[in-house]
């Protein structure tokens, strides 16, 4: 069987359990906007938002592709949008944005290989199975099996890098591309310095030879979420769902392999495309964190958008409030801009 589907599954149960705690004793019923704002101030923002998204139905699937299994969450009906998370999150990071986009689209949120509930393919000495090229090809297979030969593609962090690679390697598959808070791998490494290394520490630490970085992550799986790089305003139960990935040594090794690929073979793939003047020709939206590293590191390059326009001539975008994880921390503004992008 290609994939097994379960409606309102264990993952939704996790969300419901976390969300309903916010409602206990409140007798909220249907929230007006004013009531929601007041409630958000009085309770955890995660819980308050949840009262509005908890009624949105979604299914979960395990899709078998080329010897691996990809876990996904599916919302809505209509033209397809594929959402791809980054480090250190899973598909759960889209829990607020996905329902907004599902009003007139089918929204597919995947766990990348090794993350969350997806499979963990064996790696090789050249890290090719965890290259962005291999991961992108896998996602194309997923969408083909789901019956979506073309789709809008949105990626954040590592998922953004898988997404732009997919758009370069499979241009006929991607109708529109949105990449959140990253620049191309080659461009990031070519501009790296001490400030880069201190800010983007996972690039440096996790790309080291096995098993040094694996030992650090497994030894303190919650540490990354206490760091500004991974911190968020989510509830304890959502945090526990994220952290569970880093308690599994096989998953941690797979994640480190992806970072090793980003320091080696992914750079080669980017360089080959740049030297061949290969470009992303579909419409592209780039959003980045206001006041974050992309907003401050690359001013001399006309900002991150200036860098992206060397790769995607139709790119446009802006800075966003909410930090690196603005799709999760500021889903309202993110949703407005993505919907505008989809309507053009």
Identify the function of each model-found stretch.
Residues 36-43:
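Signal peptide processing junction and immediate N-terminal pro/mature segment
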Residues 1-14, 41:
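N-terminal secretory signal peptides
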Residues 87-96:
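The serine-hydrolase catalytic nucleophile loop
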Residues 79-85:
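Short beta-strand element of the alpha/beta-hydrolase
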